[in-house]
Amino acid sequence: MEALIVFIVLSVSGAFAYKCSYERLWFKVGSLFDIISTSSKKNVIPLASKMEVGSNEDVSSMGNFINKFYTEYSLPSHKVLQSLRVLFSLAMMTYTVTIEIILWQIKVAGMDKEVTFITTWVWPLTAIMLSFILILFQPFFIIISLLNKFYNDKFDIDRLIIVTCIILSTLIALLSYINIGPFQYTKNILTRLSIGGVTVMASLSGLATVSSLYYNFLVIWHKFRNTPMSDPSFRNINNSNNNSKSLLWTTDAYIEEKIQDYEHNIEQNVQILRSLEEEVGENSTFKAELMEKIAWYQLELGKLEALLQQSPQVRTFKKAFEVGFIIYCLHKLIITFLKRIPYIIYHSLKYPDDYDYENFSENAASDPLAITIANILDFSFFRFNYQHDLDSLTKQISLFLSISLFLCCLSAVNTTISYVVTLLPIKFQILALFAMQNDDTANVLPEYTNNSSYKGKKRNYSQEQKGISLIKNLVVSELTGVYVLATTLMVRSHLPFEVSQRLKELLGGKFTVPNIVIDSWFDEVYAFACVFTFICIRIAERKLSTKKVSVE
C-alpha cells in the first residue's frame, strides 16, 4: 500500500515538475547566465560588433541549426523547438523523481526490507531515462548548437551532425576508459558521469574557498592598515574576478566615484580608438588591447550599477552570508589539509595495495554527520532514555541533510555558471554575453495554414520563443542532472550505516562506489584545486604588477 502511495506521489510531482518546466522554467533558466552585463548609462561602443568573438561575422546574424534542418530535410522549425522543449521538461521531471526516490529510501531505511515495484521497475526506468538524456540527447544538441555558433558559414547540417557525433563519441569513450581514482571502481557510464560531477563540485569548492578567503583577507588587511584606494595592491583586488567581494565592504560614495572614473576612462579610450580608426596604418594589436580595456570598463560599470541598486537590507544579508561562508571555508581548509590529506597520504604509503580502503575505514575515527549532530542534540537538549528515540532523531536528521544537499546541488548550477563566466578572459565574457544571446530561437520559420485561429496561436508561440537560448537551457539542464547524480553518490557518506546500505541496494552494484572512495577523491580534488587556485592568483597578481596595469 505504501508503495502505491509513493507511486502516486511520484506521478503527481513528476507531472507538476514537467508542467512547470514546460510552461515557466523553459523561459527563466537563461537568466542564470546574466552574471555579467554592460552599463545602462555608458554603453558607448557596441562590444559585440567591434570585438572579434568567435567567427568574424556579426553574432546577431548567425544562422540557426534548426533552420538548417528545415532547409535540408523540410523539418518544421517549431516541431524541433517543441521537441527540445519537451526534452528539457522531461529531464527536469526525471531529476525530480530521482531525488524523491532517494529521499523515500532514506525515510524507510531500517524498516523491514521489502521489494516493491518502485525499486524493481520505476527506479531502473528512471536510470535508463537519465542515461539517454544526460549522455546522448542533451550533449548532442549542446555540441551541435555550439558548432553552429562558431562554424555557421563552414558547416552544412550534414557536416554538423557528423562532427557532433564524432565529438560526442570521443567524449563518451573518454568517460568510459578513464581509469583513475574512483573511476576504476565502476564501468557504468552513468556512474562515471556522476563521479565527473563530484570532481567538478570539488574543484569549484576549492576555487571558491581560496578566492573568497584570499580576497576578503586582503580587503580586511588593507582596511586595518588604512591603505589608500589608489594603492597598487588595491587596484589588483579591483582588477580580479572577485572585486564584487571587495566592493561589498565599500560605501556607496566610493562606488559612485568608481563609476565616474570608469565612465571618464571609457570616453577617453573611445576617442583614442576613433582616432586610430581614422589613421591609414593603424596598429591592430594596440587597437585590440584598447578594445579589451573598454570592454572591461563596460562590464565593471554593469556590476557597479547593479550593486548600487541593491537595498541596504540585501547588502547587509550578503555581508552576513559572506562572514558565515568565510568561517566555513576556514574550517574546511583546516580539516582538509591538517587531517584528511595527511591521513590519505599515510594510508597510501602504509597500505599501497588497499584499493578497497578497508584499513582506511577501520582507522578513520569520524562518524557520519547525521549521527554526530544527533548525539550533540541528545547531549545538549533531549537526553533520550531509549536508543530507538535517538535512532529516530538520527533518521530525521539524515532526511533533512539529504534534502539540504540536494538543494545545495541545485544552487551549485548557478555557482558553476557564475564562476566559469567571470573567470573567462574579457573577450570570452563578451562572447558569453552576446554570442549566446537569444538568436537561437528568434527565427522560427513560418508555416502556411488557412486556420486563422491556428495562425494567431502560432504567432503567439513564436513571440514566446523569442528570448530563449537553446544552449543556455540545455547547459543548465545538463549541469542539474550531473549534480543530482553526484549528490546521490556523496549523500551516503553523511548517513548512518543502515541508511547508506539501503540506498546502496536501491542504486544497485553497478551504480555505487564505496563511500570512502568518493570522500577521499573529493578531498584530493578539493586540495589540488585550492593549491592550484592560489598559485594562479599569485601569478596573475605578479603579471599585473609587472605590466603596471591600472584601471584608474
Curated annotation (Swiss-Prot):
Highest taxon above the source species: Eukaryota
Transmembrane helix keyword on record: yes
Protein name: Uncharacterized protein YHR078W
Key word Membrane present: yes
Species of the source: Saccharomyces cerevisiae (strain ATCC 204508 / S288c) (Baker's yeast)
GO cellular component: membrane
Topology of the protein relative to the lipid bilayer: Multi-pass membrane protein
Keywords: Membrane, Transmembrane, Transmembrane helix
Transmembrane intervals: 127-147, 160-180, 393-413, 517-537
Cellular compartment(s): Membrane
